[in-house]
Amino acid sequence: MRNIIKISALALSLLTAAASANAQVVLTQKNMSLELANQIASASVAACAANGYAVAATVVDRAGIVRAVQRADNAGPHTLGASQQKAFTSASAKNTTLAMMEGSQKNPAAANLVYIPGYLLLGGGVPVRVGNEVIGAVGVGGAPGGNLDEQCAMAALDKVKDQLK
């Protein structure tokens, strides 16, 4: 009986060791290339310019680190910071900043999101997805309303959608 218990314990420890050895310790993730980031930033600024808005667009990778920035002629200096914070917020939360803003207005507890360093709850931040995976975000600032900033970001993502498969 003791031998059976010892053999069972040994077998269990070997199975546990084998399972641990198969655990994934190095992750493989999709991320934002510089080429794609530049295309999205450029297309965002162009989409807003077509509607008469001088904006800045910032594209960040999945970690919220800036990959590309473009600022239209005559865009205000505040548009750079706003676009970066919107992109960071969207990448971090994996949601549009317009949806987050609207949610925080309806839910008093969510209003505390404004205290997270780097977050900006104004429309214009949109996640960049490959399938269901967020690989970054684009933030647009400078149009006369966050909903218009978001429209420019969405137009840019529509322009590169074939590359996001």
Residue ranges, per PLM feature:
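Bacterial N-terminal signal peptides
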Residues: 8-18
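Generic short amphipathic/hydrophobic targeting helices enriched at N-termini
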Residues: 3, 21-22
